[in-house]
């Protein structure tokens, strides 16, 4: 049976519609376009239901048939979400008070999608974190109420089944996946005490000793907590509003890894600067981080926080794994030019490098073959529209919003895991009438005084770093064999011996210093890099002693002992470099 075709929901000033995904890319005939301005829209987790509000009512339809499920007379609704099993629809509207009703009305409402009845209404003044978080099987749900977590079981919102009360719970994240459910909580520091993140397994909330893991840290005004798909670890990005050192306008960020087995670590990032994005691979064993002052670095780490692959530097601030995890897109949106780097994750080979200028939204289609990029208001009010691409860089469909109209949101219909299996990665761009938009290499600005002179390394504003595989002996990475290294060292030794035998010859005219024979490399391990650097320093000192000896200088005992250690040092250096 052929896999289904995902729909793309489009919301703007001219209404809400559903579009068939590629290859057709036509408006769905089963869904009648709503010409009224849509305030919000969402799909259910399995993609079988679609809901939107238009300032008059909230409507829920089946997808792809378009059959009506329920409609609710809720003209003020500005946000809505489905529970994971489609049993509950949560709606939220702005909290308001009147003279007749100084307490205001309960503005968070939970609706039974079977009967259409209101199950429970809560007061929720802030839109941030307005929706309850459900476990995937809806056995529990949780809300943050006055810095205290309230847990409900089996959608019974009349009774609080459990509470988690710490000093002041600011943020929480409920784990995905099967039972038992886990929750990550963040408590900001106060009165000199550090902030901390703790992981608990529901319902074991008996105190600090019941926590699965605990990570304390300073310098945190806010955090972002991201569970992996298997709920075995959380990545915590801790941020401060102001960088007291003055190094960054964005404040300071640190990345922490916290696992449910109690392990925790600070993820060491080789380049200073902000952390732009963190993304878990769907395999839950690797994650990608985009970080550092521009041009930013991007690195994939494993669950031991070790570097797996370094993508070098580039104009990027976001990372997006495909739903199957076989492709990674590194992109530079917002104030960057919209360059996208598409990588085959298994081979760590670049597939394409298209460019989508003025992009404010990017998302993967559930099939893992297509993506959508969009320019939306209010982030950017000019040139609104969206494009559907194949990941090889081909534009398959393009829509430009008419003048005077605005595009507000595009949203792919989700599907359960396993509906779209992983396909082999293609490197050849698909044919299309719209073609592809490969990024053209832009010429760097050069001052007039340097324009007629050859470009040197020192004339570059930023040092560029190429991609490098951090795994030893990784596929596609050519490393010199031991025999090749020995032959190279033997040739260098013969050349040095010839030079020693000609001490009386006039020295050749001064020239540019030759490059050091040992190529500077990085293994991602600061300790190993330090050892390599020290060994090279010692070998350089031995070379200088040999030159002095060849010139007739009498060597002292300690200098001769140093020279005798050359072979041993070369062997140590060879072992360390081969271990990269």
Swiss-Prot record:
Function: Functions in the early steps of protein synthesis of a small number of specific mRNAs. Acts by directing the binding of methionyl-tRNAi to 40S ribosomal subunits. In contrast to the eIF-2 complex, it binds methionyl-tRNAi to 40S subunits in a codon-dependent manner, whereas the eIF-2 complex binds methionyl-tRNAi to 40S subunits in a GTP-dependent manner.
UniProt feature, compositional bias: Basic and acidic residues: 494-505
GO MF assignments: mRNA binding; ribosome binding; translation initiation factor activity; tRNA binding
Name this polypeptide is given: Eukaryotic translation initiation factor 2A
Organism: Danio rerio
Residue ranges that the Swiss-Prot or TrEMBL entry lists as coiled coil: 481-578
Annotated InterPro entries: TIF2A, TIF_beta_prop-like, WD40/YVTN_repeat-like_dom_sf
Region (Disordered) location: 435-530
GO biological process: regulation of translation
């Amino acid at each position: 049976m052929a896999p289904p075709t995902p729909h793309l929901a489009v919301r703007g000033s001219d209404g809400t519609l559903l579009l068939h995904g590629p290859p057709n890319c036509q408006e769905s005939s089963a869904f009648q376009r709503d010409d009224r301005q849509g305030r919000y829209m969402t799909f259910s987790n399995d993609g079988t239901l679609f809901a939107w509000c238009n300032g008059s009512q909230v409507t829920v339809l089946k997808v792809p048939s378009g059959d009506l499920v329920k409609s609710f007379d809720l003209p003020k609704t500005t946000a809505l979400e489905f529970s994971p099993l489609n049993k509950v629809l949560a709606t939220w509207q702005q909290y308001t008070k009147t003279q007749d009703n100084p307490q205001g009305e309960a503005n968070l409402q939970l609706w039974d999608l079977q009967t259409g009845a209101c199950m429970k209404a809560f007061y929720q003044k802030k839109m941030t974190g307005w929706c309850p978080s459900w476990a995937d099987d809806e056995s529990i749900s949780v809300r943050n109420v006055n810095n205290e977590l309230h847990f409900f079981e089996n959608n019974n919102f009349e009774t609080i089944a459990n509470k988690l009360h710490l000093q002041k719970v600011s943020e929480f994240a409920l784990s995905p996946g099967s039972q038992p459910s886990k929750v990550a909580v963040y408590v900001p520091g106060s009165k000199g005490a550090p902030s901390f993140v703790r992981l608990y397994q529901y319902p074991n909330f008996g105190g600090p000793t019941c926590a699965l893991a605990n990570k304390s840290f300073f310098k945190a005004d806010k955090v972002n907590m991201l569970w992996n798909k298997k709920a075995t670890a959380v990545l915590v990005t801790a941020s401060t509003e102001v960088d007291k050192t003055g190094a960054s306008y964005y404040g300071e960020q640190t990345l922490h890894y916290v696992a449910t087995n109690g392990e925790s670590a600070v993820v060491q990032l080789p380049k200073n600067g902000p952390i732009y994005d963190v993304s878990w691979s769907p395999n839950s064993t690797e994650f990608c981080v985009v970080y550092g002052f521009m041009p930013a670095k991007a690195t994939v780490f494993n669950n031991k926080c070790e570097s797996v692959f370094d993508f070098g530097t580039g104009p990027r601030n976001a990372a997006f794994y495909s739903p199957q995890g076989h492709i990674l897109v590194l992109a530079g949106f917002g104030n960057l030019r919209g360059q996208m780097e598409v990588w085959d994750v298994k081979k760590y080979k670049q597939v394409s490098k298209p460019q989508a200028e003025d992009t404010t939204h990017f998302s993967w289609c559930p099939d893992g073959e297509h993506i959508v990029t969009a320019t939306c208001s209010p982030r950017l009010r000019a040139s609104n529209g969206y494009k559907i691409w194949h990941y090889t860089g081909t534009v398959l469909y393009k829509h430009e919003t008419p003048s005077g109209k605005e595009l507000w949101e595009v949203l792919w219909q989700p599907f359960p895991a396993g509906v779209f299996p992983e396909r082999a990665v293609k490197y050849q761009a698909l044919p299309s009438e719209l073609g592809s938009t490969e990024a053209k290499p832009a010429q760097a600005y050069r001052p007039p005084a340097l324009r007629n002179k050859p470009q040197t390394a020192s004339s570059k504003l930023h040092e560029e770093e190429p991609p490098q595989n951090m795994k030893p002996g990784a596929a596609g990475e050519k490393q010199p064999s031991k025999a090749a290294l020995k032959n190279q060292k033997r040739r260098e030794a013969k050349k040095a011996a010839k030079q020693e035998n000609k001490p009386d010859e006039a020295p050749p005219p001064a020239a540019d210093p030759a490059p050091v024979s040992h190529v500077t490399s990085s293994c991602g391990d600061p300790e190993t890099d330090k050892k390599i650097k020290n060994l090279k320093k010692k070998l350089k000192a031995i070379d200088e002693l040999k030159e002095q000896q060849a010139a007739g200088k009498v060597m002292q005992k300690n200098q001769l002992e140093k020279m005798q250690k050359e072979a041993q040092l070369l062997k140590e250096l060879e072992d360390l470099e081969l271990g990269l």
